[in-house]
Regions:
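Residues lining hydrophobic/aromatic ligand-binding pockets adjacent to catalytic sites
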Residues: 1-176
Length: 176
């Protein structure tokens, strides 16, 4: 389907025609995952809608995974608290963090994504992963501060999907 072929392409700010953009509505329970699945399956076969359905199930999986391991969330919150204090006392960390949050790193794609997120509350799903990778591996910033930046700005910011996706980028959510 068109969704399966094109969902991974970020066409730029405001040009998200290949993704559903339903996540903010699901987060606020305006619609439920079940509602979305029923609607999709009423219009498409399971084979046609398979990849879209997979993405809905990932959200549910992450929610259940984190709920059954609440210590992961508690540690993340403690880390953010500690790192927020470090931002006050470590000027190098603070400067890199501020540049990243303001979209002033000099990395064009990253800066555009930071500004899009701050201005619109949305970022394409793959841009989120690329952003996280640059945040951690290029800018050398703690993943927890990046996850916090996302949660503070994303209209669809979901504690489980966000935290566990950032953990996945840094290799903490995958065994091996």
């Amino acid at each position: 389907t068109s969704y399966t072929r094109n969902r991974n392409f970020d066409l730029g700010a405001g040009q998200h025609k290949h993704v559903s953009q339903l996540s903010a509505y699901i987060k606020r329970r305006i619609i439920t995952e079940e509602d979305v699945l029923k609607r999709v399956l009423s219009a498409h076969s399971l084979n046609e809608a398979g990849k879209f359905i997979d993405e809905i199930f990932w959200r549910t999986y992450f929610k259940g995974w984190l709920e059954s391991r609440s210590q992961i969330w508690m540690q993340y919150c403690a880390d953010v608290h500690h790192l927020t204090h470090e931002l006050q006392t470590q000027s190098g960390l603070r400067d890199r963090w501020a540049a990243a949050c303001l979209g002033e790193t000099g990395i064009d794609c990253f800066d555009a994504w930071a500004k899009e997120l701050a201005e619109t509350g949305y970022l394409h799903n793959h841009a989120r992963m690329w952003f996280a990778s640059i945040w951690v591996y290029t800018l050398q910033l703690p993943w927890q501060l990046g996850a916090d930046f996302f949660l503070r700005h994303l209209l669809d910011g979901d504690a489980a999907s966000n935290t566990l996706s950032w953990r996945w980028v840094v290799g903490l959510h995958s065994v091996g």
